[in-house]
Amino acid sequence: MTDAAIVTQKLTRRFGNLTAVDGVDLTVAAGQFFGFLGPNGAGKSTTIKMLTGLLAPSSGRAELLGLDFAAHPVEVKRQIGVVPEGMGLFERLTGAEYLQFVGRMYCLDRPTTQRRSEELLDFMQLSDRPKTLIADYSHGMQKKLALAAAVIHGPRILFLDEPFEGVDALAAGALKALLGRMTERGVTIFLTSHVLEIVERLCSHVAIIHNGRLVAQGSLEELRAGIAGEEGSKTTLEQIFLSIVGQDGAQPPQLEELSWLM
Protein backbone atom coordinates (compact mmCIF):
# COMPACT_ATOMS: atom_id res chain seq x y z
CA MET A 1 0.00 0.00 0.00
CA THR A 2 1.39 3.40 -0.96
CA ASP A 3 -1.29 5.84 0.22
CA ALA A 4 -0.20 8.12 3.06
CA ALA A 5 -1.62 7.25 6.47
CA ILE A 6 -0.11 10.27 8.23
CA VAL A 7 0.76 13.64 6.71
CA THR A 8 1.75 16.75 8.65
CA GLN A 9 2.30 20.19 7.20
CA LYS A 10 4.32 22.75 9.18
CA LEU A 11 3.08 21.17 12.41
CA THR A 12 4.05 23.48 15.26
CA ARG A 13 3.40 23.62 18.99
CA ARG A 14 4.44 26.46 21.27
CA PHE A 15 4.27 26.71 25.04
CA GLY A 16 4.65 30.40 25.78
CA ASN A 17 8.04 31.42 24.38
CA LEU A 18 9.15 27.80 23.94
CA THR A 19 8.65 26.19 20.54
CA ALA A 20 8.53 22.48 21.32
CA VAL A 21 7.74 21.36 17.75
CA ASP A 22 8.76 23.62 14.90
CA GLY A 23 7.27 23.22 11.42
CA VAL A 24 7.37 19.43 11.12
CA ASP A 25 6.55 18.02 7.66
CA LEU A 26 6.07 14.29 8.02
CA THR A 27 4.75 11.62 5.65
CA VAL A 28 4.09 8.02 6.72
CA ALA A 29 2.76 5.53 4.18
CA ALA A 30 -0.05 3.13 5.02
CA GLY A 31 1.29 -0.19 6.24
CA GLN A 32 4.68 1.18 7.27
CA PHE A 33 6.39 0.28 10.52
CA PHE A 34 7.69 3.79 11.20
CA GLY A 35 10.21 4.77 13.86
CA PHE A 36 10.16 8.28 15.33
CA LEU A 37 13.39 9.09 17.16
CA GLY A 38 14.98 11.95 19.03
CA PRO A 39 16.89 12.83 22.20
CA ASN A 40 15.06 13.57 25.43
CA GLY A 41 13.12 16.81 25.08
CA ALA A 42 13.39 16.84 21.28
CA GLY A 43 9.62 17.03 20.71
CA LYS A 44 8.66 13.37 20.21
CA SER A 45 5.93 13.16 22.83
CA THR A 46 4.52 16.57 21.89
CA THR A 47 4.31 15.47 18.25
CA ILE A 48 2.53 12.24 19.18
CA LYS A 49 0.08 14.15 21.37
CA MET A 50 -0.81 16.36 18.40
CA LEU A 51 -1.16 13.33 16.11
CA THR A 52 -3.50 11.61 18.57
CA GLY A 53 -5.64 14.60 19.53
CA LEU A 54 -4.28 15.19 23.03
CA LEU A 55 -2.80 18.56 22.05
CA ALA A 56 -3.95 21.09 19.46
CA PRO A 57 -1.22 22.46 17.18
CA SER A 58 -0.34 26.13 17.53
CA SER A 59 -0.16 26.17 13.73
CA GLY A 60 0.07 23.73 10.84
CA ARG A 61 -2.10 20.68 10.30
CA ALA A 62 -2.15 16.92 10.72
CA GLU A 63 -3.99 14.62 8.33
CA LEU A 64 -4.60 10.99 9.24
CA LEU A 65 -6.14 8.50 6.80
CA GLY A 66 -7.01 11.37 4.49
CA LEU A 67 -8.89 13.27 7.20
CA ASP A 68 -7.90 16.60 8.72
CA PHE A 69 -7.71 15.80 12.44
CA ALA A 70 -8.92 19.25 13.49
CA ALA A 71 -12.02 18.99 11.28
CA HIS A 72 -12.81 15.29 11.88
CA PRO A 73 -11.52 14.38 15.36
CA VAL A 74 -14.11 11.70 16.18
CA GLU A 75 -13.77 9.91 12.84
CA VAL A 76 -9.98 9.85 13.18
CA LYS A 77 -9.99 8.66 16.80
CA ARG A 78 -12.24 5.73 15.88
CA GLN A 79 -9.49 4.45 13.58
CA ILE A 80 -6.37 4.87 15.72
CA GLY A 81 -4.97 3.10 18.76
CA VAL A 82 -2.53 4.61 21.25
CA VAL A 83 -0.16 3.27 23.89
CA PRO A 84 1.03 6.53 25.47
CA GLU A 85 4.10 7.11 27.60
CA GLY A 86 1.93 7.39 30.71
CA MET A 87 -0.53 4.55 30.21
CA GLY A 88 -3.44 6.09 32.14
CA LEU A 89 -5.17 2.79 32.93
CA PHE A 90 -8.16 2.60 35.28
CA GLU A 91 -6.39 0.79 38.09
CA ARG A 92 -9.49 -0.15 40.10
CA LEU A 93 -10.70 -2.43 37.30
CA THR A 94 -9.51 -5.91 36.39
CA GLY A 95 -7.86 -6.41 33.02
CA ALA A 96 -11.00 -8.02 31.60
CA GLU A 97 -13.22 -5.22 32.90
CA TYR A 98 -10.93 -2.61 31.38
CA LEU A 99 -10.86 -4.24 27.94
CA GLN A 100 -14.63 -4.63 27.97
CA PHE A 101 -14.98 -0.95 28.86
CA VAL A 102 -12.65 0.08 26.02
CA GLY A 103 -14.40 -2.20 23.54
CA ARG A 104 -17.80 -0.73 24.38
CA MET A 105 -16.35 2.78 24.18
CA TYR A 106 -15.44 1.99 20.57
CA CYS A 107 -19.04 0.79 20.00
CA LEU A 108 -18.18 -2.88 19.59
CA ASP A 109 -21.14 -5.12 20.39
CA ARG A 110 -20.97 -7.12 23.62
CA PRO A 111 -20.24 -10.55 22.07
CA THR A 112 -17.40 -9.12 19.96
CA THR A 113 -16.00 -7.22 22.94
CA GLN A 114 -16.14 -10.34 25.12
CA ARG A 115 -14.48 -12.55 22.50
CA ARG A 116 -11.72 -10.09 21.67
CA SER A 117 -11.06 -9.37 25.35
CA GLU A 118 -10.60 -13.06 26.10
CA GLU A 119 -8.37 -13.59 23.05
CA LEU A 120 -6.20 -10.59 23.86
CA LEU A 121 -5.83 -11.51 27.53
CA ASP A 122 -4.79 -15.03 26.52
CA PHE A 123 -2.27 -13.72 23.99
CA MET A 124 -0.83 -11.23 26.49
CA GLN A 125 -0.60 -13.99 29.13
CA LEU A 126 -2.87 -12.05 31.47
CA SER A 127 -5.84 -14.43 31.63
CA ASP A 128 -4.54 -16.42 34.61
CA ARG A 129 -5.37 -13.59 37.04
CA PRO A 130 -9.01 -12.78 36.25
CA LYS A 131 -9.72 -11.05 39.58
CA THR A 132 -6.45 -9.13 39.89
CA LEU A 133 -6.88 -5.37 39.77
CA ILE A 134 -4.74 -3.41 37.33
CA ALA A 135 -3.27 -1.57 40.34
CA ASP A 136 -1.64 -4.88 41.32
CA TYR A 137 -0.19 -5.56 37.86
CA SER A 138 3.54 -5.19 37.32
CA HIS A 139 4.71 -2.43 34.97
CA GLY A 140 5.23 -4.95 32.18
CA MET A 141 1.75 -6.42 32.67
CA GLN A 142 0.23 -2.95 32.54
CA LYS A 143 2.13 -2.25 29.32
CA LYS A 144 0.74 -5.43 27.73
CA LEU A 145 -2.78 -4.53 28.83
CA ALA A 146 -2.39 -1.03 27.39
CA LEU A 147 -1.41 -2.56 24.05
CA ALA A 148 -4.39 -4.93 24.18
CA ALA A 149 -6.71 -1.97 24.78
CA ALA A 150 -5.11 -0.05 21.90
CA VAL A 151 -5.85 -2.80 19.37
CA ILE A 152 -9.19 -4.22 20.55
CA HIS A 153 -11.15 -2.20 17.97
CA GLY A 154 -8.85 -3.07 15.05
CA PRO A 155 -7.22 0.34 14.45
CA ARG A 156 -5.74 1.35 11.10
CA ILE A 157 -2.96 3.36 12.77
CA LEU A 158 -1.26 2.34 16.02
CA PHE A 159 0.87 4.80 18.01
CA LEU A 160 3.33 3.15 20.41
CA ASP A 161 5.47 5.08 22.90
CA GLU A 162 8.12 2.75 24.39
CA PRO A 163 5.83 -0.31 24.05
CA PHE A 164 8.41 -2.90 25.17
CA GLU A 165 9.56 -1.12 28.32
CA GLY A 166 9.32 -3.53 31.24
CA VAL A 167 8.04 -6.39 29.06
CA ASP A 168 9.88 -9.71 29.40
CA ALA A 169 11.79 -11.08 26.41
CA LEU A 170 9.35 -13.92 25.67
CA ALA A 171 6.31 -11.63 25.60
CA ALA A 172 8.21 -8.96 23.67
CA GLY A 173 9.01 -11.48 20.94
CA ALA A 174 5.34 -12.42 20.59
CA LEU A 175 4.31 -8.75 20.51
CA LYS A 176 6.85 -7.97 17.79
CA ALA A 177 5.50 -10.85 15.71
CA LEU A 178 1.94 -9.57 16.18
CA LEU A 179 2.89 -6.04 15.16
CA GLY A 180 4.68 -7.35 12.10
CA ARG A 181 1.56 -9.26 11.03
CA MET A 182 -0.53 -6.13 11.53
CA THR A 183 1.65 -4.12 9.15
CA GLU A 184 1.39 -6.92 6.59
CA ARG A 185 -2.36 -6.36 6.44
CA GLY A 186 -1.96 -2.61 6.07
CA VAL A 187 -1.94 -1.27 9.63
CA THR A 188 0.45 1.65 10.09
CA ILE A 189 2.59 1.54 13.24
CA PHE A 190 4.21 4.72 14.57
CA LEU A 191 6.82 3.72 17.14
CA THR A 192 9.00 5.73 19.49
CA SER A 193 11.72 4.06 21.51
CA HIS A 194 15.10 4.90 22.98
CA VAL A 195 16.22 1.34 22.25
CA LEU A 196 17.57 1.92 18.76
CA GLU A 197 18.27 -1.78 18.14
CA ILE A 198 14.52 -2.44 18.39
CA VAL A 199 13.71 0.36 15.96
CA GLU A 200 16.36 -0.85 13.52
CA ARG A 201 15.04 -4.40 13.65
CA LEU A 202 11.34 -3.55 13.31
CA CYS A 203 11.04 -0.34 11.30
CA SER A 204 11.40 0.10 7.56
CA HIS A 205 11.36 3.91 7.75
CA VAL A 206 12.58 6.37 10.38
CA ALA A 207 12.35 10.08 11.15
CA ILE A 208 14.60 11.92 13.61
CA ILE A 209 13.51 15.05 15.45
CA HIS A 210 16.01 17.30 17.22
CA ASN A 211 15.33 20.58 19.02
CA GLY A 212 11.76 20.45 17.72
CA ARG A 213 12.73 20.17 14.06
CA LEU A 214 12.73 17.20 11.74
CA VAL A 215 16.37 16.63 10.78
CA ALA A 216 16.12 13.31 8.90
CA GLN A 217 13.43 11.16 7.31
CA GLY A 218 13.53 8.14 5.03
CA SER A 219 14.13 4.42 4.79
CA LEU A 220 17.03 2.93 6.71
CA GLU A 221 18.80 2.42 3.39
CA GLU A 222 18.36 6.09 2.51
CA LEU A 223 19.67 7.20 5.88
CA ARG A 224 22.66 4.89 5.57
CA ALA A 225 23.35 6.25 2.09
CA GLY A 226 23.70 9.69 3.63
CA ILE A 227 26.68 8.51 5.68
CA ALA A 228 29.89 9.37 3.86
CA GLY A 229 32.30 6.63 2.84
CA GLU A 230 32.08 3.07 1.65
CA GLU A 231 31.18 1.84 5.13
CA GLY A 232 27.82 3.61 4.99
CA SER A 233 25.91 0.43 4.14
CA LYS A 234 27.19 -1.15 7.38
CA THR A 235 26.30 1.80 9.56
CA THR A 236 23.96 1.04 12.45
CA LEU A 237 20.96 3.18 13.29
CA GLU A 238 22.68 4.20 16.52
CA GLN A 239 25.64 5.53 14.54
CA ILE A 240 23.30 7.38 12.17
CA PHE A 241 21.39 8.86 15.11
CA LEU A 242 24.52 10.02 16.93
CA SER A 243 25.96 11.44 13.72
CA ILE A 244 22.84 13.52 13.07
CA VAL A 245 21.94 14.76 16.55
CA GLY A 246 25.60 15.39 17.40
CA GLN A 247 26.04 17.88 14.59
CA ASP A 248 25.07 20.79 16.83
CA GLY A 249 28.39 20.43 18.67
CA ALA A 250 26.90 19.05 21.88
CA GLN A 251 29.47 17.17 23.92
CA PRO A 252 28.73 13.91 25.75
CA PRO A 253 29.05 13.91 29.54
CA GLN A 254 32.65 13.54 30.70
CA LEU A 255 33.38 10.69 33.09
CA GLU A 256 36.18 12.69 34.66
CA GLU A 257 33.58 14.94 36.25
CA LEU A 258 32.53 11.97 38.40
CA SER A 259 36.01 10.80 39.28
CA TRP A 260 34.93 10.41 42.89
CA LEU A 261 32.74 7.46 41.78
CA MET A 262 35.52 5.62 39.98
Regions found by a protein language model. Give the residues of each.
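Conserved catalytic motifs of ABC-family nucleotide-binding domains
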Residues: 154
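A short, surface-exposed alpha-helical micro-motif characterized by mixed small hydrophobic
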Residues: 199-200
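Helical segment within the ABC ATPase nucleotide-binding domain
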Residues: 172-185
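ABC ATPase "signature
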Residues: 217-218
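Conserved ABC ATPase "signature" region
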Residues: 100, 104, 111-129
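Catalytic Walker B motif of ABC-type/P-loop ATPase nucleotide-binding domains
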Residues: 158-162
